[in-house]
């Protein structure tokens, strides 16, 4: 694996760049934000897939209320681009999991999803009310969730944006969702690690990670570009690592 001569994050699809900037701006407002220690070989990754250069860049943080905040941007040659972001809460806090993903190619954005996913059956009441107050755009191409999509809330937004106008609207939806989450996080207090509610949220987050790992497309791409052992390490330790036992 060799570094590229130019910045692989240049010339990204406009929505990938815009959404990444929106997410970074949102996490700057979080309390006690600090970098999360990560193995050097998992921060900036270069490989090759089908003769094209694959780059994966990762940014990781933690803060009060969230055990891990992860933004991943991947690019394959001049074609496929992926933005993946997850904010995993500390199970002692009654907060949902934020998740957003974009898949872009030469023909544009094929998939865009954002959700605040519950870890204890249903969304916390302040989060649900906050999302209810958001005026959702009438996107023209709503996509069906995968079979393992039961982990998502009723407020999940999964679309194929139809043009630059809908791409801008989707970016605003993500900003709105993050504002709701950030506001709730600023007012949340930790519960004891031994309470039933904390344990339930821990188990709910375990299930979320388990279901996300069922996405075989991710594993196949990583195995082909690197090797099965490396792919397993990347998925288990970085993408969807289990929360620490309370």
From Swiss-Prot:
Reaction equations catalysed: (2R,3Z)-phycocyanobilin + 4 oxidized [2Fe-2S]-[ferredoxin] = biliverdin IXalpha + 4 reduced [2Fe-2S]-[ferredoxin] + 4 H(+)
InterPro entries reported in the protein's UniProt record: Ferredoxin-dep_bilin_Rdtase, Ferredoxin_bilin_OxRdtase
Presence of the UniProt keyword Amino-acid biosynthesis in the record: no
Alphabetic keyword roster: Oxidoreductase
GO BP: phytochromobilin biosynthetic process
Listed GO MF terms: cobalt ion binding; phycocyanobilin:ferredoxin oxidoreductase activity
Top-rank lineage group of the source organism: Bacteria
Enzyme Commission identifier(s): 1.3.7.5
EC top class named in words: oxidoreductase
Role this protein plays: Catalyzes the four-electron reduction of biliverdin IX-alpha (2-electron reduction at both the A and D rings); the reaction proceeds via an isolatable 2-electron intermediate, 181,182-dihydrobiliverdin.
Protein family: Belongs to the HY2 family.
NCBIfam families registered for this protein in UniProt: PRK02816.1
Name the UniProt record assigns to this protein: Phycocyanobilin:ferredoxin oxidoreductase
Organism: Synechococcus sp. (strain CC9902)
Gene behind this protein: pcyA
